[in-house]
């Protein structure tokens, strides 16, 4: 069909920023991360579906699966059995959780969408002008003035080039965006069933292999799950050793020596320091949080403070639930 200039132009769903000078706010990459639970089953719904599924197997009559015939504690104990594979685990696949993950750098984005079990919706980069999007800086770089200045300049220069290419209208936003750095931020919606969500948390809490941002995402998501289903405290455990790291850090190479089958970035954290190793077995001769810039101020890092605060909240939920169940 031909163009018709008598038609009124549509209202585009995005803001056009042609000719605007780029603006950039910089944030600490960990302090900027937020996790919001935007949709989930209620505790009552989870207890109900777990009871119905588990009791169906040996029921003589369809009414025998009615959760109204038992106590709340029995319903909770049944859900614990489901969560820990002591009963039919299928109910976990019936319970969906949707999170909004914001303040993510594009490095975190690549890690998250690699988890194939989730369903995702993304903040667009193709036909949305990115010239005013924030950027993040790791604490170690913030503690290194000579590197932080260069970091900021590279971000600002790349965003200016992006804006100028877009403004030319001879280069589309689709092509111009390729110049932008990974430290630009975005948000994603992520939906997982409970079974895959618990697996995601268990995998991403590993401080030896996973980056600090992933560790915090796991802790924040765990906190949100426990606020809905305190029964999940029987499954979620941030104090256990990271056994993939432990088992792959130093293994026989079949030639009389040893090699690594995993990620040997740092020395083991205290909870993982349960095997013998040589100091040179890792890329860095230190633990992760000891590497904190050329002007390392010492003391607790941003990660440590956020991590410990969140785990304290999680422990409080676990303690209250165990008291409710009559446990010490």
Residue map of PLM features:
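Family-specific signature for flavin-dependent thymidylate synthase
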Residues: 1-328
């Amino acid at each position: 069909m031909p163009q018709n200039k008598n038609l009124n132009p549509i209202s585009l769903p995005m803001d056009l920023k042609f000719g605007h000078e780029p603006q950039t706010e910089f944030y600490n990459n960990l302090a900027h991360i937020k996790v919001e639970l935007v949709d989930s089953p209620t505790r009552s719904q989870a207890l109900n579906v777990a009871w119905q599924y588990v009791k169906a197997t040996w029921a003589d009559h369809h009414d025998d699966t009615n959760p109204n015939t038992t106590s709340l504690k029995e319903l909770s104990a049944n859900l614990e059995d489901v969560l820990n594979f002591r009963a039919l685990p299928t109910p976990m696949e019936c319970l969906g959780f949707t999170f909004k993950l914001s303040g993510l750098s594009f490095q975190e984005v690549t890690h998250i969408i690699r988890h194939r079990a989730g369903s995702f919706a993304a903040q667009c980069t193709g036909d949305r002008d990115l010239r005013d999007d924030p950027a993040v800086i790791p604490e170690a770089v913030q503690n290194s003035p000579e590197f932080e200045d260069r970091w900021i300049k590279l971000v600002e220069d790349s965003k200016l080039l992006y804006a100028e290419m877009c403004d030319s209208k001879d280069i589309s936003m689709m092509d111009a965006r390729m110049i932008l750095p990974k430290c630009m931020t975005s948000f994603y919606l992520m939906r997982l069933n409970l079974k895959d969500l618990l697996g995601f948390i268990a995998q991403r809490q590993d401080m030896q292999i996973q980056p600090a941002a992933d560790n915090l995402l796991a802790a924040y998501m765990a906190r949100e799950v426990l606020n809905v289903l305190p029964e999940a405290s029987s499954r979620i455990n941030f104090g256990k050793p990271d056994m993939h790291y432990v088992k792959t850090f130093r293994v026989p190479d079949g030639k009389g020596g040893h090699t690594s089958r995993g990620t040997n970035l740092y020395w083991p954290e205290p909870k993982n320091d349960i095997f013998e190793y040589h100091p040179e077995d890792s890329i860095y001769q230190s633990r992760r949080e000891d590497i904190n810039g050329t002007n390392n101020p010492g003391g607790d890092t941003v990660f440590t403070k956020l991590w410990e605060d969140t785990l304290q909240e999680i422990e409080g939920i676990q303690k209250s639930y165990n008291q409710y169940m009559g446990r010490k």
